[in-house]
Amino acid sequence: MVFCGDGGLSCESIDFALCCLRGRSGNYVQSRILPMADASPDPSKPDTLVLIDGHALAFRSYFALPPLNNSKGEMTHAIVGFMKLLLRLARQKSNQVIVVFDPPVKTFRHEQYEGYKSGRAQTPEDLPGQINRIRALVDALGFPRLEEPGYEADDVIASLTRMAEGKGYEVRIVTSDRDAYQLLDEHVKVIANDFSLIGPAQVEEKYGVTVRQWVDYRALTGDASDNIPGAKGIGPKTAAKLLQEYGTLEKVYEAAHAGTLKPDGTRKKLLDSEENVKFSHDLSCMVTDLPLDIEFGVRRLPDNPLVTEDLLTELELHSLRPMILGLNGPEQDGHAPDDLLEREHAQTPEEDEAAALPAFSAPELAEWQTPAEGAVWGYVLSREDDLTAALLAAATFEDGVARPAPVSEPDEWAQAEAPENLFGELLPSDKPLTKKEQKALEKAQKDAEKARAKLREQFPATVDEAEFVGQRTVTAAAAKALAAHLSVRGTVVEPGDDPLLYAYLLDPANTNMPVVAKRYLDREWPADAPTRAAITGHLLRELPPLLDDARRKMYDEMEKPLSGVLGRMEVRGVQVDSDFLQTLSIQAGVRLADLESQIHEYAGEEFHIRSPKQLETVLYDKLELASSKKTKLTGQRSTAVSALEPLRDAHPIIPLVLEFRELDKLRGTYLDPIPNLVNPHTGRLHTTFAQTAVATGRLSSLNPNLQNIPIRSELGREIRKGFIAEDGFTLIAADYSQIELRLLAHIADDPLMQQAFVEGADIHRRTAAQVLGLDEATVDANQRRAAKTVNFGVLYGMSAHRLSNDLGIPYAEAATFIEIYFATYPGIRRYINHTLDFGRTHGYVETLYGRRRYVPGLSSRNRVQREAEERLAYNMPIQGTAADIMKLAMVQLDPQLDAIGARMLLQVHDELLIEAPLDKAEQVAALTKKVMENVVQLKVPLAVEVGTGPNWFDTK
């Protein structure tokens, strides 16, 4: 009896199919033909193939970790769990990792059996989006990713396994699908959830069958999760007993047909289910000979650091950065391929210079010289955007020599050392251990190792800050982070020269050191401090000559001194009224419950309002509202704010849903997290300012992101009441008024717009009057609102369609308004045209101070892409110059405020928040206004609105 034949797919043969590899664009494309490695593995190359079942690991991570979302509400816990395991496995140099996903189409098993996998629970609604993010990160990091149309990930993994075994590789499979047990042998093992390895012995011990019998066993028992029927009434114990007695499924059925199989009840069940068993056998049998084009011995394909950084920033997965950096550093463990799976943490490396500098040979280092200023620091923080992070390593580099700073082990490590007699009672000297005693010993040893690993994670070995005593500045990559870390612990230093700031001025796409090191030195950014110091020193010699005079001046007078200002702001933090925010959260919760009740009443049913899918069904199917747009990712009818706003008046449920979403986001992003982010030692909130994250030169902030606290909603404004002044102080808010419009008037050199600002007119009322041909006194609120919308929207390429939607006016009326607007202010149109011409000719646009942004998309043949780049191009000189002006004002203000006992706390958009002694409030307010308004002289005056109050809200 042949169970894989008769029209079914054989485990040993299958029609050839094309292997498809997911392209960087996200579309399926035929894979590149990669050279096959025919020889045995090179000792210098990976010798272990790690195959990850992508969907299985994503599901495992989703349910293993508590829900986690970023500030935008996007769930990320499956992404975090998946990537941490992937990076952990990939860090070991002996491993080549390949990720395999199920295709988004049905496979041949679905065609054979309509009910295949129909018994599985519905996929959580927020998981597919996370899986797509995982795909994008895997691609960006350069890990091979395979998806084979018509076949499951299991089949691809099975085929890769047999290919790898034929070339002498060890294979480790990360999957929760027990079908993989049919692949196991002495060289192929499955990595279990607890990182133990499952091989033939473990399968036989647990299930009572050999791996060669596994498909027969599954054919008898079936698989409820895949809706594979098996033999009705035959359970695992009976199936194992039958195979132990008869050896194979074929022999079992020979005995059943001959009448020799006992008991009769079992024989009858087998014969009644014979067709189902045959069918189950076919479904369980993996395909092992797919013609996959993959190169063995290559750890990673070319990666894309820019895409990786964009994804990490967008998803706010900052904890993954050190692990990603570690991909290119020294491996943590030895060459034994299973070490990493059996140990939670790496051994501490020896602290000699040769071991500390794996990326460079000694002769090469000797040729590298540091800048004239002297020693350059390299360092490793456990987290680079958190002042509570631990300084894990530091080193200096000078004249070709790297010297690691000594690391001190915390006292807590002693708690992890096992007493000498811990295993004494398990090791009697007069007789060998029993099996039970051996297991108890192994468990105790593993528990002790886990305890050591956990304590080393909670209390890592760190650099003694005394190493930095006597330093006035620290020259390093991302020097602000190191200076802030030291200063908050009492060793006050200033950030010195920083290659990241040089690189950021050369091209704002240079947002982090992995990108910079690769781009300018063709080096990977290492995980160890000595090599980081060496690369930093070399970059500080290579990058400055690349700057022109304008950007060199920006470095010396703006970015470098600002780095110190921002570091001090981070160390100071801002005081937060946690009780107030918690009360506000409770009130928001009450309102959310009320909104939920009203929404359900209008819907006529209860549903999960936070679920886009369920909300889509209620709004567009049940209530039959008109859908205005579809999502790019899934093609579903959109429930985003931009899609619901035009429907606000179409049904009373819409404004309730919009309010629910806003309240829910504010509560989850600010009200609940902020009190937990307050430093228990200082009692203040310490955000981190990102100086090199935004292409226009603007600052951004992390942990928390204070740039996105809304000010238009009532609750958004209320949140600002939670930011308070210290006792004896008051808060002062200084906000540039309409700075981008004023800069537009200056740069576009439009006389009519300049005149309005010089005369101190209401620019929006003046615009409405001039465009509509009215007297300013007769302009009503709606007309002024239309003019305001166009004034601000023109910098972002506002179309007539957008204006029509925003104002609720006919398209023709909106188009006419924009046409007359440009006729009224012809300098604006000239500015746009000139900027685009300049960008096409030079490849970049720039601010008044010379900050550049490169705009290659201006020559794109894709109209949508080109028009988006055009909007970016003529917006950047305005927005970027506004950012430059704010930075200069901060640099000038900082020492003057310090001299009178005041201090800058926050910078948000065009606003500064300052804390001043109560008796100096008027003096500080006047000083701030004067400095900010006179930091640069334009053809129109800069205007700064200043207010004081006990909290941020009351400064307005």
Swiss-Prot record:
Phenotype reported upon loss of the gene: Increased sensitivity to ionizing radiation (IR), lag time before DNA synthesis/repair commences increases considerably, decreased rates of both DNA synthesis and DNA repair following IR. If combined with a temperature-senstitive mutation in dnaE (catalytic subunit of Pol III) viability at 37 degrees is dramatically reduced.
A single GO BP: DNA-templated DNA replication
Similarity field: Belongs to the DNA polymerase type-A family.
Family annotation (CDD domains): DNA_pol_A_pol_I_C, H3TH_53EXO, PIN_53EXO
Segments forming domain 5'-3' exonuclease: 209-296
Gene3D superfamilies in the cross-refs: 3.30.70.370, 5' to 3' exonuclease, C-terminal subdomain, 5'-nuclease, Ribonuclease H-like superfamily/Ribonuclease H, Taq DNA Polymerase, Chain T, domain 4
Self-association and partners: Single-chain monomer with multiple functions.
Protein keywords: DNA damage, DNA repair, DNA replication, DNA-binding, DNA-directed DNA polymerase, Exonuclease, Hydrolase, Nuclease, Nucleotidyltransferase, Transferase
Pfam families: 5_3_exonuc, 5_3_exonuc_N, DNA_pol_A, Taq-exonuc
Domain of life, per lineage: Bacteria
InterPro entries hit by this protein: 5-3_exonucl_a-hlix_arch_N (IPR020046), 5-3_exonuclease (IPR002421), 5-3_exonuclease_C_sf (IPR036279), DNA-dir_DNA_pol_A_CS (IPR019760), DNA-dir_DNA_pol_A_palm_dom (IPR001098), DNA/RNA_pol_sf (IPR043502), DNA_polI_H3TH (IPR020045), DNA_polymerase_1 (IPR018320)
Catalytic activity: DNA(n) + a 2'-deoxyribonucleoside 5'-triphosphate = DNA(n+1) + diphosphate
Name of the molecule in the record: DNA polymerase I
